[in-house]
Each structure stands twice: as C-alpha cells, then as structure tokens.
Amino acid sequence: MSLAEINKNEVDIVIGALNADLTQFLTSWRPFFSGFHLIVVKDPELKEELNIPEGFDVDVYSKTDMEKVVGASNSTMFSGYSCRYFGYLVSKKKYIVSIDDDCVPAKDPKGFLVDAVTQHVINLENPATPLFFNTLYDPYCEGADFVRGYPFSLRSGVPCAASCGLWLNLADLDAPTQALKTEKRNTAYVDAVMTVPAKAMLPISGINIAFNRELVGPALVPALRLAGEGKVRWETLEDVWCGMCLKHISDHLGYGVKTGLPYVWRNERGDAVESLRKKWEGMKLMEKSVPFFDSLKLPETALKVEDCVIELAKAVKEQLGSDDPAFTQAADAMVKWVQLWNSVNSSA
C-alpha cells in the first residue's frame, strides 16, 4: 500500500501538546502529516498559547473545549499526556495515529526518513495473525509469506485492532532500569512487524501508536494512574494498564495487535531517578495486575467493546479493589470512560 492508496479522510492524527511551541515538531513531520486531519489537544495545565505553523488541517482543543464536551468534573481525566485520550474521544475517523510532541521522524538503515503514518495504516489495513506465530513475522509484508506448516485455515487472519510502533534513541525502559543505565539508548532498527500472540500481554504507549477506532476505540481507556502521573515520565502506569486492557479485549473479540515498524526518534526528556521516586508504587501494582489478566475470562455475552470494558471494570473492582484503592479508582474511571464515549458519540 502506497501513500496514494491511503484514504486520508479515514485517518486522524492525534497530538497531545505538552509543549507550547509545536513549530519544530510539526515542521519535521510536514512531509508525512500533509493532507491528513490533525487533532491537537493542549494539556489543560499548559498556560501558554500554542504556536502552530501554517499549512496544516488542524483542530485544537483546550481545557475550555474539554469542559464543554465532557463537563468540568470530567476534564481532569485528560491532564498531562492523558490529554491525547480526549483526541481519541472526539475523533470521528476510522483510524487514529498518535505521536508525541517530543518525537521526530526516524531514519531507516539506508538513511531515509520513515513515514510512520503510512506504515501504521498498512499495519491496520492488513490482517493480524495472533493464533499461529509466523516466524517470518508479518506474512502480509512485502517479501514475506506464511511459513512451512502454517494452517491454511488460519491464513486469512483476523482484523488488526492496533499497531504499536517503536522508537529509537530514548529507550523504552522502566524507571529503575533507566536510572541504572543512564547512557542506554536504543539504536537497533529491526525491520519487521509481528502480531502479538493471543493471550500474551503487552504495554502500549501513545508515544507512537495507531488503532482502528471503529473496532476498539473505547478500549483505549485512561484509568489506572498514580498521583501526579502523566507529565514527563519513563514508566507510565496508565499506558501499561491501557495496553493490557486493549489486548485482552482484542483477544476476546477475535482481533489482533501488531508491534514493530514504524519507528520514530524520541528526544531526551525527563529524569529517571525522579520518576523512580514517584512511580515505584506502580511497579507493585503491575505485579498484581499480571496474574489478574492472566486468569481473567470475559463473559461470552460481552460482544461489544463497551460491554467488555464494563465487565473488565467489574472484575477489577471485585478482585483487585481490596488490594489497593488505585484499582477501585481505575474501575470507576473505566465505567466513566464508557459513559463519556457513548455520550459524545451518540450526539455526533
């Protein structure tokens, strides 16, 4: 699939703006964002006016806009990096591509800039293969195919719900690892896309992700978070939890999730030691979350994404709520998210 074959009217690019001056960011992405509709969501705590260069088809949402859409009491859900979720909420397009404002286009091993938007759409348009692992990675990629022994009955694949891209430079590490390995950088460009196997868990990150909003939009849920989380961080509990919810719901509904290409280049940001001081509680919560998701089975009656999120929230409150109040708050946030999703989209 080439850029000429992509229906740009089906794609929204969502950018959570934590920096007021987006000139350098958008200029670097102009060759790949041109012609697409952009949703820029301003961090509600950012006081400065946004600086956006001309030549983009863009809608900007501020704290005032959030309050008009979801109410003042609910706008607190969208602080810091969580502001990107507001973009997911108000979009009306089939596909969402989310890229953080501290990222620029990466270069492939040949020195060419990577068109992350096109690669994400290619990943989403082609089926996923979560039920039988293809050792040649994505069999739908150019130059690849199904390996020896791959069942013909499974070669049609399943719909792809999400494309989880990667990034170079600032490595995708948690705070303890980054604090110990302060000079560690990701320089490995792996030219591959693969489907995450069914029943396997993974974190996601809005730093570089795309998803089919029509298939799984409500599953991208801002829920489990720590006090003060959402600004500059290595380990963001909300992203990790969201990924586990998205993957479990995708497995339940028969969808697939891909990871690998495209890469972006992530600039330096944050302090790992400071992040560790704030977020070590989150690591303990994750140790409780993994066995929960491992044993969780959603009811067969949950046929819609919204139903799955509600059932998941119910299980979280019943099975994890007594362990930590953060889980109870997460369950309540998941229910609230579905209510907001239904309200905003029913009024469209």
Curated annotation (Swiss-Prot):
Catalytic activity, reaction form: UDP-beta-L-arabinofuranose = UDP-beta-L-arabinopyranose
MF annotations from Gene Ontology: intramolecular transferase activity
Residue numbers covered by motif DXD motif: 100-102
Tissue: Widely expressed at low levels.
E.C. no: 5.4.99.30
Protein location: Cytoplasm, Cytosol; Golgi apparatus
Keywords for the protein's UniProt record, in alphabetical order: Cell wall biogenesis/degradation, Cytoplasm, Glycoprotein, Golgi apparatus, Isomerase
Name of protein: Probable UDP-arabinopyranose mutase 5
Organism: Arabidopsis thaliana (Mouse-ear cress)
Designated gene of the protein: RGP5
